[in-house]
A protein has these predicted regions:
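Short helix-loop "hinge" at the ATP-lid/N-box region of the Bergerat-fold HATPase_c
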Residues: 33-34
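A residue-level detector for a conserved hydrophobic packing site
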Residues: 22-23
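Short alpha-helical Gxxx[C/S/T] motif in the catalytic ATP-binding
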Residues: 89, 94, 98
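Short beta-strand/loop element within the Bergerat-fold HATPase_c
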Residues: 40-52
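Conserved catalytic submotifs in the C-terminal HATPase_c
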Residues: 4-13, 50
Length: 124
């Protein structure tokens, strides 16, 4: 799809976690960023500290989410109306599972529109 992954990772950031589960959560965020971005879009991954605590973010460019949909994104089977098409697929369970995994790790994920796209931020 010609998308570019750009990362800014702070060395030495660790969290006590089930690496497999946490990998699934982060993988889902990355997959969504790619799936809902156009060809040639930039996907940005950041890892560092926010307010002294470990955090990471995944941000896409070129795609946004309606304000009405934002509060519902982590609900099971929820899909924003515009995302229901054959090219994106999905069951509406991905972000729900992300939330369940992060809850288990004492982490919180927020999703917001930015000037360029959508950013998911995970705070541990």
């Amino acid at each position: 799809r010609g998308q570019q992954l750009v990362s800014a990772l702070t060395p030495g950031i660790t969290v006590p976690a089930d690496a497999s589960l946490l990998g699934k959560a982060v993988g889902n965020l990355l997959s969504n960023a790619s799936r809902y971005s156009p060809e040639g879009a930039e996907i940005r991954v950041w890892c560092g500290r926010l307010e002294g605590r470990p955090a990471l973010s995944v941000e896409n460019t070129g795609a946004r989410i309606s304000g009405d949909a934002l509060p519902h994104l982590f609900e099971a089977f929820y899909r924003e109306e515009g995302s229901r098409n054959r090219s994106t697929g999905g069951s509406g369970l991905g972000l729900y599972l992300v939330k369940m995994i992060l809850d288990r790790h004492g982490a919180v994920c927020t999703i917001e529109n930015t000037e360029e796209g959508v950013k998911a931020t995970v705070r541990f």
